[in-house]
Design a protein with these regions (language model features):
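N-terminal beta-alpha supersecondary unit
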Residues: 1-64, 183
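Surface "functional belts" at beta-alpha junctions
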Residues: 22, 34, 89-182, 212, ...
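Glycine-rich phosphate-binding loop signature in dinucleotide/nucleotide-binding domains
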Residues: 50-55, 105-107, 149-151, 197
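Acyltransferase
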Residues: 134, 177-226
Length: 226
């Protein structure tokens, strides 16, 4: 199956095209890139390089968050537009699931990717590696409350660790500080999307929305003013 993976949930964005589990084309952008301007041109560039036509794609997989409001909104809109235009199926992939792939070679039993959600909170989800399943829902939570939920020796990583390192240091956790582990990979988005699709999971184009977990700052200010 030929899959286009789109990942723009953070400051670093990337697009990948996979043929089965093989990455055949990829574009990555550094901090400060413009999601809106780069995403379409990068897809076109990849197709030119690998000499594929857009219609060769069998499935469009998009990372839906949590993460950057702007990045997620643009990625989802782009995925829906491509799905409509090409008549191809689209599948949503939660970003925290994608991040877990960054530590798939680690032997830790319990894993928790942590994304900085600002305003003294983080996005997180706890996974049981042995049972290959989530222990919790996708969370927006304070670091203090998250640490109370984590079993000792849990492997934690992601850009939500550094801002609250003193809090996470209060417990015997396995902390990986490599910044690269906090960057979701579009190739993993494509692979996970393919797995979900082959498992029979479907996503209607009209129902595809970002996984924000909380309202934007503007929405919260509006509610507070009422």
């Amino acid at each position: 199956m030929k899959v286009l993976g789109i990942e723009t949930s953070g400051l670093v964005g990337n697009i990948a095209v996979c043929d089965g589990n093989t990455v055949v084309g990829k574009k990555t952008y550094g901090k400060g890139f413009s999601h809106g301007k780069e995403i379409v041109s990068s897809i076109e560039s990849i197709f030119d390089e690998i000499r594929w036509e857009p219609n060769d794609i069998d499935l469009i997989a998009v990372s839906i968050g949590p993460g950057s409001y702007t990045g997620l909104r643009i990625a989802v809109t782009c995925a829906k537009t491509l799905a409509y235009g090409l008549g191809k199926p689209v599948i949503d992939v939660p970003t925290l699931d994608v991040l877990v792939e960054n530590v798939k070679d680690n032997n830790a039993k319990t894993i928790c990717p942590v994304i900085d959600a600002k305003r003294k909170s983080v996005y997180a989800c706890i996974y049981d590696r042995d049972k290959n399943r989530k222990i919790t829902d996708y969370l927006i939570i304070s670091p203090d409350n998250l640490i109370d939920m984590l079993p000792e020796t849990t492997l934690i990583f992601g850009d939500g660790i550094a801002p609250y390192k003193q809090i996470f240091a209060q417990k015997e956790l396995t902390i990986l500080s490599d910044e690269k582990l906090g960057i979701a990979d579009a190739a993993d988005v494509a692979r996970l999307g393919m797995e979900r699709y082959e498992q029979g999971i479907r996503c209607e184009i009209n129902s595809l929305i970002p996984l924000y977990l909380r309202k934007s700052e503007a929405e919260e200010r509006l509610m507070e003013s009422r």
